[in-house]
Amino acid sequence: MSCCGGNCGCGSSCKCGNGCGGCKMYPDMSYTESSTTTETLVLGVGPEKTSFGAMEMGESPVAENGCKCGSDCKCNPCTCSK
């Protein structure tokens, strides 16, 4: 998935918007060392997801006014009313 400032999706005037999470879809998992704070991160616990909606069918997950996010995070095709 391409990213546009962390947000990939078509907004007004076929510009990049806040449609999907893009690069910022997952929380920051960077490592920082601290002697006073303890943090526990648990991964992989939860019910199994059996359906992925539009992603499963190969469609773009974001479409607004006929716009879909292209490979370089420019809306393609652009059929928005401007």
From Swiss-Prot:
Factors inducing expression: Strongly up regulated by heavy metals.
Tissue localization of expression: Mainly expressed in flowers and first leaves.
InterPro entries (UniProt xref): Metalthion_15p
An example molecular function term from Gene Ontology annotations: metal ion binding
Keywords: Metal-binding, Metal-thiolate cluster
Keyword ATP-binding belongs to the record: no
Tree of life domain: Eukaryota
Keyword Metal-binding tagged: yes
Function: Metallothioneins have a high content of cysteine residues that bind various heavy metals.
Family per similarity comment: Belongs to the metallothionein superfamily. Type 15 family.
Protein name per UniProt: Metallothionein-like protein type 2 B
Organism in which the protein naturally occurs: Solanum lycopersicum
Lineage: Eukaryota, Viridiplantae, Streptophyta, Embryophyta, Tracheophyta
